[in-house]
Amino acid sequence: MTIIRKKHPLIKIINHSFIDLPTPSNISSWWNFGSLLGLCLIMQILTGLFLAMHYTSDTATAFSSVAHICRDVNYGWLIRYMHANGASMFFICLFLHVGRGVYYGSYNMIETWNMGIILLFAVMATAFMGYVLPWGQMSFWGATVITNLLSAIPYIGTTLVEWIWGGFSVDKATLTRFFAFHFILPFIITALVLVHLLFLHETGSNNPTGLNSDSDKIPFHPYFTIKDFLGALILLMAFMILTLFFPDILGDPDNYTPANPLNTPPHIKPEWYFLFAYAILRSIPNKLGGVLALILSILILAIMPLLHTSKQRTLTFRPITQTMYWILVADLFILTWIGGQPVEYPFTIIGQTASIAYFTIIVILMPIAGMIENNILDLD
């Protein structure tokens, strides 16, 4: 078996990636989320495939086809709710994975980090298009509002929006193409994940100390396969509790009403995992400014390596920057809450304050904190 594992052209790639991979011995449970994201991706592709067998991407029948899946298909209700809540689990793992990367300075592995940002955008695009497919009220109006943001682009904006719509409003052509893109994107994401892993295995994993761990590496199997398996069990347990006991808790009741272009819902809002970015978008009165802030709220991650001023890689031994980091996390929770609130006082002012705080902490306060900590170290 050892000979095949190490000599076979295909199996040896798997061997070097998941079995004999030299791994830092001290990586904590925060390093579990990569494998959990892989598990989420596999679950989403499988449940999505079974849903696609029964779904019809036509405005006249899309809503009915989803109802048919839930009522008439064997375990269709389970597949549908696993897919819907699987997206939420995916984003929980994604946010924790990115948060871990920021905390432990993993952004210094620039190729891996940039690939991760591309993956984040791809997953967000996939989730957005998937939310449109059931063709409920929030699906329709969410698609209308978010695609309309592109009209803020000077000169080509309106033409671009109509090109994406395939007409002069969100209609049959839009739904059909969104289904096509929603189907193909997860496979593109899978390919990007392999590139992400390729870059990661060029440098090796980071670790909680941020120090070089070449002198203290252990094989990935069995130590971390067991650890990842435990993480997967915990994730699946939480996921099944969510899916079987609270399937609609993260959804919007408006999406159980068929799409009606003549009736606007009182509060148009995206799924919970986009609310922080939506709050940043709404906090700027100017349309183009809002769109730029929305894109920058994610793209700001790309300049994190440039904002790293500390002599130490991680935040493990940096209490001042740690404080800034946890204030940033609290700020993101506030933004998520504000994104789901109506546009009225005091929510608007809270949203604007939280949006300013978000960019200020990342661009100004954390780099300054890093420099202060450098000076404290020099004093010693």
Swiss-Prot record:
SUPFAM superfamilies: a domain/subunit of cytochrome bc1 complex (Ubiquinol-cytochrome c reductase), Transmembrane di-heme cytochromes. It is a multi-pass membrane protein. Keywords: Electron transport, Heme, Iron, Membrane, Metal-binding, Mitochondrion, Mitochondrion inner membrane, Respiratory chain, Transmembrane, Transmembrane helix, Transport, Ubiquinone. Pfam families: Cytochrom_B_C, Cytochrome_B. InterPro entries: Cyt_b/b6_C, Cyt_b/b6_C_sf, Cyt_b/b6_N, Cytb/b6-like_sf, Cytochrome_b, Cytochrome_b_C_euk/bac, Cytochrome_b_N_euk/bac, Di-haem_cyt_TM. It is found in: Mitochondrion inner membrane. Binds 2 heme b groups non-covalently. Heme b b562 binds at H83, H182. A ubiquinone binds at H201. Heme b b566 binds at H97, H196. Signal peptide: none annotated. Its cofactor is heme b. PANTHER family: CYTOCHROME B. The cytochrome bc1 complex contains 11 subunits: 3 respiratory subunits (MT-CYB, CYC1 and UQCRFS1), 2 core proteins (UQCRC1 and UQCRC2) and 6 low-molecular weight proteins (UQCRH/QCR6, UQCRB/QCR7, UQCRQ/QCR8, UQCR10/QCR9, UQCR11/QCR10 and a cleavage product of UQCRFS1). This cytochrome bc1 complex then forms a dimer. This is Cytochrome b. It comes from Microtus richardsoni (Water vole).
